[in-house]
């Protein structure tokens, strides 16, 4: 049986922490930034943990 390949799109979008949590980038930081407050942009710029409902699928795509 051949090796399982890591999903290319998933490896670009998700980071796995040392404890095994999967982090993703919050949406909303691509355009129209001039109308958003600096506080809002700071919040949006932080990595967010992936929802538990999506965790199983993401782990499979990442080969974990």
UniProtKB/Swiss-Prot annotation:
Q: Which UniProt keywords apply?
A: Ribonucleoprotein, Ribosomal protein
What biological-process terms (Gene Ontology) are attached?
translation
Q: Which PROSITE patterns match?
A: RIBOSOMAL_L35
Which Pfam family, an example, fits this chain? Ribosomal_L35p
**GO molecular-function term, one example from the UniProt record:** structural constituent of ribosome
Q: Which Gene3D superfamilies match?
A: 4.10.410.60
A cellular component term, taken from the record's GO annotations: cytosolic large ribosomal subunit
- Kindly list any coiled-coil regions of this protein: none
Q: Which NCBIfam families match?
A: rpmI_bact
Q: Which family does it belong to?
A: Belongs to the bacterial ribosomal protein bL35 family.
Protein name (database record): Large ribosomal subunit protein bL35
Designated gene of the protein? rpmI
